[in-house]
Amino acid sequence: MGRSLKKGPFIADSLLRKVEKQNAADDKSVIKTWSRASTILPMMIGHTIAVHNGKTHVPVFVTEQMVGHKLGEFAPTRTFKGHIKDKKGGR
């Protein structure tokens, strides 16, 4: 179930201020954030946002196709190492 249209998309206030500040200054430096739940807005296109995955900040370059998605979708938190093969021969 999605968020109500009456409320609008969620975006952290600090992240929104940083993006607006960079847009006004025409600056495209990396923005570091821990807000994985923030929705990507059209004003973020072209910015590189470093999203925290629990260990490090993963740089995410925002494109037009990402608008409407959450930042956390593009910074995976788990690494799959693969299933262990059974040893042949046994005892």
UniProtKB/Swiss-Prot annotation:
GO cellular component: cytoplasm; small ribosomal subunit
Family matches, as SUPFAM superfamilies: Ribosomal protein S19 (SSF54570)
A GO BP entry: translation
Keywords attached to this entry: Ribonucleoprotein, Ribosomal protein, RNA-binding, rRNA-binding
Pfam families in the record: Ribosomal_S19
Sample GO molecular function, one term: structural constituent of ribosome
InterPro entries referenced in this protein's UniProt entry, alphabetically: Ribosomal_uS19, Ribosomal_uS19_bac-type, Ribosomal_uS19_CS, Ribosomal_uS19_SF
Protein's job: Protein S19 forms a complex with S13 that binds strongly to the 16S ribosomal RNA.
Family membership: Belongs to the universal ribosomal protein uS19 family.
Name this protein carries in UniProt: Small ribosomal subunit protein uS19
Gene giving rise to this polypeptide: rpsS
